[in-house]
Structure formats: structure tokens, C-alpha cells
From Swiss-Prot:
UniProt keywords, alphabetically: Cytoplasm, Hydrolase, Protein phosphatase
Keyword Nuclease: no
Lineage, uppermost ranks: Eukaryota, Amoebozoa, Evosea, Eumycetozoa, Dictyostelia
Gene designation: ptpC
Stretches with biased composition (Low complexity): 52-88, 100-117, 137-191, 250-271, 278-293, 310-327, 334-413, 796-806, 834-850, 878-916, 924-968
Record's protein name: Tyrosine-protein phosphatase 3
Residues that span the membrane, as ranges: none
UniProt KW Cytoplasm keyword: yes
Enzyme class name: hydrolase
Length: 990
């Protein structure tokens, strides 16, 4: 199992590449390594079979093999350890000590460490990597030349000539080597596999030799795997698995077969991919030391030509190593029961004829399951390979470091410190949000929206919003009001300043300076500031474009009462007067009272709830309707001297609010210049840019920007003007048909009660416009609220009661008129005289009927015009035109009976002729006459005696009704007593 604590060192002169598996930036070294090389970390050989503890000290000899140890083959595996063992350093090596290492055998007296290590049980774990690759040496590092004779073995193949050139003490070794002809080896034909991992470096290696001991590898092991990791180079993926193929059995052949395996490396110049394992298999036929068929390690890729013996090659290599690296310190570590010979100067070997092998793809230390780690590149070489290995030192942690590369001589404390730093940085790579927080620590006041007003510093532009006492009044810390256009409140004694998150927005038509106020949804702590702004700016229309909660997130707080119970916000008292729903638009009439003020103000709240956050409404019809209603109520407020800006808010006050304001501005331009398209210059882009100069971030998303075009195109299409998408529209606005634009402004002050007739003069009778204006009729006539009682001003200092608003009354009373004041209050003492006058007039009519009814008609003074829909709300007899005249005649007769005292003004005229007016109601004047144009004069002989008659009575019944005049007079007296003054209650007509 490969540990996940892999790390690498980052340098300032590194080139970054991306790991193809994890997309993690990897540092690939571009530095040129120094001439001296280090081998601080060498691979560790761990047994994969714990029951076999015997190891063989394999020295590449020419002809003789000690078969005493070859009888117990062990399968060995190579791995590395995470624990860093202390390494033993020595400054110099002489030739005698080198010979001791070369001629080392487990049977000598100085090999106690080797014998002890043979008893160790090793973990069969897979490849483990650490910061320092440890070599457990089998020798006691004896520098005594006299002990060389005791450490000699029969496996040494050094010639006398070579030993004489090196050291005189090696004569003993040569003497022992001359006995190679003795047939001590019973298994002379046994195949020996020399499994030697080696790594080839460039001419300028960067690894320090850790030990020069020969490698002890069992001869008959099946497969050996070695992972090489180099941390001295600035690469992070110099990991390779060096696989040694099984033994190749050959009983009679004396040829040499060599199998090489390359390591998987990166593009680092330190660790080249030519490092191979050479498996030399050969046969020993009791030959002498001069045998040329012996397995000779000549280098990394040796040839099969006649080469010196193994001892000569090793001595030459060690001499060259000592001459070149004598100034460096060498570190030594213990390897359990094994030792390796590190050959680091292979390129300087004149006998090395290397054949390059293809490089494997990069393997990141973070992708342990990568197939590149376990890919093998096997080549068959004609020569035997070298028994030398070089391991790279592993660094700790897994991330880039900004520190410069360490010096060549590093201590373990520095490595531990670097390991901890790299571990922390790798954790930051796993969590990029942590790195982003750190990188943006000094940029917390940079906001996400585009700022089109080119200013140097945000602090200058949002100075008031960034003050400590005002910063908490912002719903979103990245949506702040511009300093130049923000709304400034009047400071009050309680300590509240002048700040509120709101900006003035100008229109694009004349007389539209500061026509809008774009603000955020009020917070619980800023509701009183919001109503203070409404009062100080004298606003009469509030447009809310958000819900209280959207997608599980709170977007706004309730700042107005939802029931008829009034609520207090600071120094203001809000009362919900009435509320009507129309096409997903809630229209609420609010009464705003202020402490110290006598009379309230009426504010209309338009709440549209079908606009999604950061999106666009499903259709443009509702937004067009909302725009018409806003302008209508704005003009109505102007008539009441509350012509303040239209307050528009959503949640943040920039996205939906900016979209609606842009639509309303362009619709106003179309309305103003609709009849003259040459002056109408509509540019959505310029409009949005102007909005963003006044408040930052207006129109947030692309969908909202496209929705503006959609709505304006629909308006232009209805107007008969080509749409904005038409190419000809860009040149000029050509009229397809001359259709006047609906006018939204009201030139004259509107009456107290609105009817559809009041808007016919200013708005064309289109379907959408009539539907949008019907809400005003609902607000004024067909209210869903019960009759409201008179509300007292809680802040009033006088005892004067505030009369209810005219919008709350469903019936209109007749205004006061002196001419009609007394007839509605008849005294009882005049009843007798009236009855006598009625009897006399009836007798005169029977004796002398009038010849012309129209000539003697009497007209009464006109009354103030009233709408018939209020006077006859409960009338249900207007089925057809034929019955309408009879109904009006009966109603007029009943009115005459109720107000019979009015007859003393008639100067005893008994002729009640037809007035000739139409039978559709009252046209400008209130006439107490019959409207039957086709009946005879006898139909109205007794106008005060028709109470007991049916609706379809004839002229023959009039004489019978005259007999009951006395009884009717008494009944009229009782009815006249029940009549009340119009000051108290309105007239009820049935």
C-alpha cells in the first residue's frame, strides 16, 4: 500500500504542468544538477516471504559460485520506509575498506550484523516512500587494512594484477581466488539470476553516494520490485517500479541473457529513464577465472564482448568514485539483511555502451493508482547489466512551496520542516476555497457587479455606506448606494443618521428629475427609516417586486400591516385601509400617520409576486399593466400634493428594480413621443448604462436585459411602430398605422370617486388598458372590505375626528342645498292644508282637463349631477326599454309621496305634464316629473295617491284612488316623519 504522504519540493525556477489525472499543478524541475551527485536515499529490500530469512551475498564473479547459499533462494521485494533512520556518515574510504565491502561474506567474523538481520521478519507491504531512503549496511565499516584477509570470500574474482595495482593487502584475496578450480560447488550448473536495480544519471548527477557496499539479492527469487523516488531533483513524480523478471533456466547453454526494465520518470534532467535492471543468467562449468562467459557487470547496459572481471569493474568504479567525490560526506544507513552497491558514475564509464529505452509517461505522486506507476518497459540486452542501484530521496508533503530550493547539504530538521509546510500547502490545494479566502483577504470590498462609473476608489464612491454605524444597515454588503445619488434623510434627535440604502433615479422625459427611488427591501432595523423616507419625499406609490421568501431564503421583511389592525414603526403609525388583488398584483391603500401631524397621507402599495429572483417574468402583460398603474396612481398623488418619487424595491434593489424602472422609462418615452417617432430615441443599452451610473449593478442578469427588449417591442408593436429588432427601426421609427398612444397623465384634477367614464378621455379603449384600470374601479366601488369605522389619529392633539376617506364610502349623499333642505323636513301642521289643496286640484282636473300638457309643464331648479350607478345600485327593474319608463314613473311617484310637502311650491297647478326627457336615467338635472311620453294627461291627475296602485295601473283606477286621499294623507305624515336629513345618511331609492 503506497502511502499518501508523498511530497515534493517546489522551487522558484520551476515550470508548472498539470497532472493528467487530478489537474494538480506539478513542479517540473528545469535546473541543471551539479557535477557531484548524492545517493542519500537508496531503495530498501524487504522480503516478501517471511519464512525465508537466508540471504545471499551475490558478487558478480567470473566462474565460481558459492552454492552453499544458493540452495535457499529467497524472493525479495524492494520498498521504502516512511521512518527515517539515522545514517552513519564517513568522510573517506580507502581501497582496503572497499575490498572489505566487495569481499563481504556472511561467514566472516565481522558479519554479525548480517546474521542478525537474517532473523528479522519484514513487512510484505507494497511500495512505501519516505523522505530519506535508508540502506542497512551489513559491515561494521572497518577501515583496518589488516582485517581484509578475514573478510575475504571464495566468491571474489579479482586478478592478481588488479589487486597489485590497488593494494598490496589484496594479495591474500588473490590467493584465495586462485582456488576457484576446486569443485566445492555441487550445483555448478545452477542458474543464478543477478537482480540489480540501477539508475543512470546524466553527466552531472545530483545524488550523493550513501554506501558502496555490494548488493545482496537472492539468486532464485521470482520477482523483485523497486520504486525509485528522487526528491533531490525538483520533480514530484520520479517514481518507478523496477520489475525483475523470473529466473531463466538454462541447463546447457553458456550464453548470457539480460533483461532490463526501465523506471517511470518525469522530464527531470536528474533522473533519466535509462535505469535498468540487468538479470544475468549464466552457467558455471567449473571454469577458471579466465572464463569469458561469466556474467560481467560493465555498466548499466553492458555488452556481451570480452570485459574485465567483476572485481576489476567494481574496483575501477570505486576508484573513479573516490577521486571525483572525495570532498563530499557520505551517509550510511542500515538495510535489513541486504546491502547495495550504488554506481552513480555510469556515464563516465568508458566500458558502458548504453542503449536508451523509451521514457514512460509522467506519474504524479498524488495518483498512486495510475497505470504509469505499474507499467514496465522490458528490453533484452545482449550484454550483462551492472549490479548497481541509485535511489532518489523522497521529500515530504504534496504541494508546491514558495520557498527556494534547499542547498545540497540539508539536515533532517529542515526536511521535517519542509514536510510540514508542504503538507499544509497540499491541503490548501485540496480546498481551493481556503486559498481564495486568503488571496482575497485584502479585497473584501470589491464587489461582483460591473461599475460603469470610472472612479479610482470604492471608498470614495461609497463613503457613507462603509461607515461603521451604517454598514449594518445594508442587506447585502456588496450592494451599496452611490454617494452622489443616495437619498439623504433628515437626522432626528434619536440618533438615527441620514443614511438609507437608496438612490435617486432620473427619468428620460422632461420634468422627470428624481422620478424614482431604487432601494433595498427594508431590514427590521431600517423599517422606520424606510417610512421616514416615504414621508420626507412625499411619495404616494410604493412598488414591491419580491416575495418575503424565495427558494428558502429570506428576501424581505414585512414593513406594512397585513390586517386592518394598525401598526407602529418608530414615529409612524400605518393603517391598512383596503386591499384588492388584480392579476397577481396586490393593491393596498395605506394611511400613514406621523407623530405631530394632524392628517394622514394615503400611500398605495403595488406588490407583484410573480417575478423570480435573478430572472424575468413569464409574460410582459403584467409588467405593462403594473407600469400603467404606477403612472396612474402617481398622477393621482400629484393632484393631492403628494407627488414624490415612485419608490421601487426588490430584495437588493438592483436586479428586478432596475429592470422595471428601465421598462417604465422607455414606456414613458414612447407615450411622450409616440405621435412623433422622429424624436423618439429608444436605446436600451444607454438606458441601462445611465441607471448604473446612478445606482450600481442595475439590471443584474442577461435574462432581465432581454426582457426589457421584449416588453418594449410589444409596446411598439401595439403602437404600430416597427419593433427594435427590425433593421429599419434602427434608422427611423416608421409608423405603420396612425394609432395614438394611450395617455397616462391626467390633465385635470380627478374627482373623489373614479369610474371608468373618468378615464375614457385620457386612455384609449384598448383591452389591456381597460383591464389594468379596472382595478381602480374595484378600489373605489366594489370594495371587499366591510365598512370602516372612523379612525382617530393616535398622534392628534385635538378632539377633531378624522372623517373616513371618500374611497371607503359606497353610497354618495346629496350635497347640501338650501332649496331642498326644508322640503325634506315637512312640519306636521301643514298636512291638513295640503290635503285640501290636493282635493281641490283633483276636482278641477276632472272638470277642465288641459289641452296641451307640454305647455304647462313646470321645471324645478337643477341639482348637482349624480352618477346613476350610485343612486340605483339596488335597482333590479331595468330589463328592457319598454318597462324602464314605467319603473321611473313609479319611482318618481314614490319620491313625490315621500316629499309631499314640496307641493306647496306648485302655485295650485293641477297639470303634471310630461317633461319629454329620455327614459335612461337622469341627464344632468333632477326632475320630479313623470317620464312617460306616450300616456294621456289623466295618468298623472293624482300624483300623490299612487302608493297602493300596481306598476301597470290604468287610467280607470285613478278615480277610485282619489277616494282614499284622506287615508293616504295620514300615511304620508308617518312617512315624512321617517325622512332624515341628507347630512346624516344618504337617500335610499328603491
Amino acid at each position: 500500500m503506497i502511502s499518501s504522504s508523498m511530497s515534493y519540493r517546489h522551487s522558484t525556477n520551476s515550470v508548472y504542468t498539470l497532472n493528467p489525472h487530478l489537474n494538480i499543478p506539478i513542479s517540473t524541475s528545469t535546473t541543471i544538477p551539479p557535477t557531484s551527485f548524492y545517493a542519500n536515499n537508496t531503495p530498501e529490500m524487504i522480503q516478501s516471504q517471511s519464512e525465508n530469512t537466508n540471504t545471499n551475498n551475490i558478487n558478480n564473479s567470473s566462474s565460481n559460485i558459492n552454492n552453499n547459499n544458493n540452495n535457499t533462494p529467497d524472493s525479495m521485494s524492494m520498498s521504502t520506509s516512511l521512518s527515517s533512520s539515522p545514517s552513519v556518515s564517513f568522510n573517506h574510504l580507502d581501497l582496503n575498506s572497499i575490498n572489505n565491502k566487495i569481499n563481504n561474506n556472511t561467514t566472516t567474523n565481522n558479519n554479525n550484523n548480517n546474521n542478525n538481520n537474517n532473523d528479522d521478519k519484514f513487512d510484505t507491504n507494497a511500495l512505501k516512500l519516505s523522505n530519506t531512503m535508508i540502506i542497512k549496511n551489513n559491515n561494521n565499516n572497518n577501515n583496518n587494512n589488516n582485517n581484509n584477509n578475514n573478510n575475504n570470500n571464495n566468491n571474489n574474482n579479482n586478478n592478481n594484477n588488479n589487486n597489485n595495482n590497488n593494494n598490496n593487502n589484496n594479495n591474500n584475496n588473490n590467493n584465495n581466488n586462485n582456488n576457484n578450480n576446486n569443485n566445492n560447488n555441487n550445483n555448478s550448473n545452477s542458474n543464478i539470476e543477478i537482480n540489480v536495480p540501477s539508475i543512470q544519471f546524466d553527466n552531472e548527477p545530483a545524488m550523493e553516494v550513501d554506501s558502496v557496499a555490494p548488493l545482496n539479492v537472492p539468486s532464485n527469487h521470482t520477482r523483485t520490485t523497486l520504486a525509485m523516488h528522487n526528491t533531490k531533483s525538483l520533480s514530484t513524480s520520479n517514481i518507478g517500479l523496477l520489475n525483475i523478471l523470473p529466473n531463466q533456466q538454462s541447463s546447457s547453454s553458456s550464453s548470457l541473457s539480460s533483461t532490463t526494465t526501465t523506471t517511470t520518470t518525469t522530464s527531470s534532467s536528474l533522473l533519466m529513464p535509462q535505469s535498468l535492471f540487468n538479470n544475468s543468467t549464466y552457467n558455471n562449468h567449473h571454469n577458471n577465472n579466465n572464463s569469458s562467459n561469466a556474467g560481467i557487470v560493465g555498466g548499466l547496459n553492458g555488452s556481451t564482448s570480452s570485459l574485465p572481471t567483476q572485481a576489476q569493474v567494481q574496483l575501477q568504479q570505486m576508484q573513479q568514485q573516490m577521486q571525483q567525490h572525495q570532498q563530499h560526506q557520505y551517509k550510511k544507513a542500515n538495510l535489513s539483511s541486504l546491502s547495495t552497491v550504488v554506481d552513480n558514475n555510469l556515464n563516465n564509464n568508458p566500458m558502458n555502451t548504453s542503449t536508451s529505452s523509451p521514457a514512460q509517461p509522467n506519474a504524479s505522486p498524488f495518483s498512486f493508482s495510475s497505470s504509469s506507476l505499474f507499467s514496465n518497459s522490458s528490453l533484452s540486452n545482449s550484454g550483462s547489466g551492472s549490479a548497481s542501484t541509485t535511489s532518489t530521496s523522497t521529500s515530504s508533503s504534496n504541494s508546491m512551496s514558495s520557498s527556494p530550493p534547499p542547498s545540497l547539504k540539508t539536515s533532517f530538521s529542515q526536511l521535517d520542516e519542509d514536510r510540514e509546510k508542504m503538507r499544509l500547502e497540499f491541503e490548501m490545494i485540496k480546498k481551493p476555497e481556503m486559498a481564495s479566502k486568503k488571496s482575497h483577504k485584502h479585497h473584501q470590498r470589491h464587489y461582483s457587479h460591473n461599475d460603469l462609473d470610472n472612479r479610482k476608489h470604492d471608498e470614495e464612491k461609497f463613503f457613507s455606506a462603509l461607515q461603521p454605524n451604517n454598514y449594518g444597515k445594508n442587506r447585502y454588503h456588496d450592494v451599496l448606494p452611490n454617494e452622489s445619488t443616495r437619498v439623504r434623510l433628515t437626522p432626528i434627535e434619536s440618533g438615527d443618521g441620514d443614511y438609507i440604502n437608496a438612490n435617486y433615479i432620473n427619468g428620460e422625459v422632461p420634468n422627470s428629475y428624481r422620478y424614482y427611488i431604487a432601494c433595498q427591501a427594508p431590514l427590521p432595523s431600517t423599517i422606520k427609516d424606510f417610512w421616514r423616507m416615504v414621508w420626507e419625499e412625499r411619495s404616494s406609490v410604493i412598488v414591491c417586486l419580491t416575495k418575503l421568501e424565495e427558494n428558502g431564503k429570506k428576501k424581505a421583511d414585512v414593513y406594512y400591516p397585513e390586517t386592518s389592525q394598525a401598526q407602529e414603526y418608530g414615529s409612524f403609525w400605518i393603517h391598512l385601509h383596503k386591499k384588492v388583488m388584480f392579476k397577481d398584483i396586490g393593491v393596498s391603500s395605506l394611511h400613514l400617520y406621523k407623530k405631530g401631524e394632524e392628517f394622514p397621507r394615503e400611500v398605495v402599495l403595488l406588490h407583484y409576486t410573480q417575478w423570480p429572483d435573478c430572472g424575468a417574468p413569464p409574460s410582459s402583460s403584467h409588467i405593462r399593466t403594473l407600469s400603467v398603474m404606477v403612472n396612474t396612481f402617481k398622477a393621482r398623488g400629484s393632484a393631492k400634493n403628494t407627488n414624490g418619487p415612485v419608490i421601487v424595491h426588490c430584495s437588493a434593489g438592483i436586479g428586478r428594480s432596475g429592470t422595471f424602472i428601465s421598462i417604465n422609462i422607455n414606456m414613458a418615452k414612447i407615450e411622450r413621443f409616440g405621435n412623433d417617432p422622429s424624436q423618439m430615441n429608444i436605446s436600451i443599452k444607454d438606458s441601462v448604462l445611465e441607471l448604473r451610473r446612478q445606482r450600481r449593478g442595475m439590471v443584474q442578469t442577461l435574462d432581465q436585459y432581454i426582457f426589457i427588449f421584449k416588453v418594449i417591442n410589444d409596446v411598439l408593436t401595439d403602437m404600430g411602430i416597427r419593433s427594435l429588432s427590425s433593421p429599419s427601426k434602427r434608422r427611423s421609427c416608421e409608423m405603420i398605422k396612425s394609432t395614438p398612444m394611450p395617455r397616462l397623465d391626467i390633465s385635470i384634477p380627478p374627482p373623489l370617486t373614479f369610474t371608468p367614464k373618468d378615464f375614457q378621455s385620457s386612455i384609449s379603449p384598448s383591452t389591456d388598458m381597460i383591464a389594468s384600470l379596472s382595478i381602480i374601479t374595484q378600489m373605489t366601488q366594489t370594495l371587499k372590505f366591510p365598512p370602516q369605522q372612523q379612525q382617530d389619529n393616535p398622534f392628534s392633539k385635538s378632539s377633531i375626528k378624522i372623517s373616513p376617506s371618500p374611497l371607503n364610502s359606497t353610497n354618495i349623499s346629496i350635497p347640501k342645498n338650501q332649496q331642498f333642505q326644508h322640503p325634506f323636513q315637512i312640519q306636521p301642521q301643514l298636512d291638513l292644508n295640503l290635503q285640501q289643496q290636493q282635493q281641490q286640484s283633483s276636482q278641477q282636473l276632472n272638470d277642465n282637463p288641459p289641452l296641451n300638457m307640454s305647455s304647462n309643464s313646470i321645471k324645478f331648479p337643477p341639482v348637482t349631477s349624480l352618477s346613476s350607478c350610485h343612486l340605483f345600485e339596488d335597482s333590479k327593474n331595468n330589463d328592457n326599454n319598454n318597462k324602464q319608463q314605467q319603473q321611473q314613473q313609479q319611482q318618481q311617484q314614490k319620491n313625490n309621496q315621500q316629499c309631499s310637502g314640496f307641493s306647496h311650491f306648485l302655485n295650485n297647478n293641477n297639470n303634471n305634464d310630461n317633461n319629454g326627457s329620455s327614459g335612461g336615467g337622469f341627464n344632468g338635472s333632477f326632475l320630479f316629473n313623470s317620464n312617460n311620453s306616450g300616456s294621456s294627461s289623466t295618468n298623472s291627475e293624482c300624483s300623490n295617491n299612487n302608493k297602493n296602485n300596481n306598476n301597470n295601473s290604468n287610467n280607470n283606477n285613478n278615480n277610485n284612488n282619489n277616494k282614499n286621499s284622506d287615508n293616504n294623507g295620514t300615511k304620508d305624515k308617518d312617512e315624512n316623519d321617517s325622512c332624515e336629513s341628507p347630512r346624516v345618511t344618504p337617500i335610499k331609492c328603491f
